[in-house]
Amino acid sequence: MGHVDVARVSLALPDGRLLLDEVSLRVGEAQKTALIGPNGAGKTTLLRIIIGDLAPDSGTVTGSGGLGVMRQFVGSVRDDSTVRDLLVSVAPPRLRAAAAELDAAELAMMDRDDRPTQLRYANALAEWSDAGGWDAEVLWDTCTVAAIGVGFDKARWREVRTLSGGEQKRLVIEALLRGPDEVLLLDEPDNYLDVPAKRWLEQALIDSPKTVLYVSHDRELLARTAKGIVTLELGAAGNTTWVHGGGFASYAQAREDRNSRLEERLRRWDEERVKLRALVLRLREKSAYNDGMAGAYQAACTRLERFERDGPPRAVPRRQSVTMRLRGGRTAKRAVICESLELTGLMKPFDLEVWFGERIGVLGSNGSGKSHFLRLLAAGGSDPDPEHRPVAGTPIGAVRHSGQARLGARVRPGWFAQTHEHPELIGRTLLDILWKGDRHRDGMGREQAARVLDRYELAVAGEQQFETLSGGQQARLQILLLELSGATLLLLDEPTDNLDIASADALQAGLEAFEGTVVAVTHDRWFARSFDRFVIFAADGSVVESDVASWDEGRVERAR
């Protein structure tokens, strides 16, 4: 089995700010370790250093056993890549190289059929075989059946963007767990997964003999699988790590105890410095008229200089403080009305009424149509009019349906996109986005914009472009824009997926104070506890209402 060892790694950002300050951690053989911390603290950056994508300014990374990697973007792939491309991308390096050469040789054969081209193709096939390509395809067949319900031959050329986010995640995780690499780095493996798939992931990690370092904010996953927890903590001069050798059940108390010890050490250090400075002052006064005290004075000065040169003990990490002020406004009593609504090719016709002020959770398996339902409402329903125009400039694709979905009077939908798709924000900094505003919200002065960003712990990222933010920072910005937009109906598609624990708590507090209606798709079992009732997209294609959450719905059976 393999291991990962990170020793005193530091990295500065291009603007000179220190992001990681002598970060250290070790993941031993077969250990399951979680990497947690605030959004934007550098978790994904640290994984990229371990992978080798980034070179640290100082420190070392060593390991053994081969490295399998699932990057954070898996689940939100929207390009023209195929299922085969995705599986090849997480294969070992030799297999990736063999696949690239085989693809190039096949393209060359289409242009010309001369002897050198034929020889190149034959050599590429031989290398594909020697690299384990045929064996990999047998393994991938098992993975595609488990993840999307069809064999590899049928799924091979299917575009990844036609899969739900959860199906993309499940496919890659299946391939990595069954693959040859002994060390796995998983960036947000639970994002986009429905609850049955999360339960599968939990058991798969427990059963796997592989060494796993994963980033997650899902407390259920942490509690069930993590045997060690590495926390990236915010620091004034760069973020540092604290390693907890136990599980999540003991984590909160252990961290509180450790922070109390740090506070006590710092208090004692401050007291000692005050005493030493007072001693130096007394001896200086005495030595001014007593030559015999000169030696004692110099000794005290040396002692104080050495004490201050060694510096204070490690400071208590800065605590996150996210404050969301979602306001809303009064609307008609019936906020959403669905009559014989059928999402074409997804779910059977259903009726639904959502009343002003309700908190509705939308549950069901991946691919069942939940996100399509939210997009239909976000676009204003079946026959949108100006009163129901969305409060954001994000393009919303048409949703094929029959029947009717209507919004009540004064209902303004605000949509939180699961994949953070905001082409209108690409290339723009956060301060620029808030300063200029758009047709849905007024702009604001730079000082006011900075204060608003600070409430969301985004002030430090104010000059960053939207696409360079971490997933959690993008999620917080989406919620901030909803706060400023005047939405009275919040349509939230997996809003807690990328949020760290403190931000998820802040979102729940913000929703409790929101004077409006909330409809949220979620697979977050903790987040769902705050909802009034649930709309369940069932495995048989029906849509049913329930007062209790149901997490056991299987995949909707349809042609794939």
Name each model-derived stretch:
Residues 141-148, 279-282, 303-310:
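Short amphipathic coiled-coil heptad-repeat segments
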Residues 98-109, 124, 269, 273-283, ...:
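Non-transmembrane amphipathic alpha-helical segments
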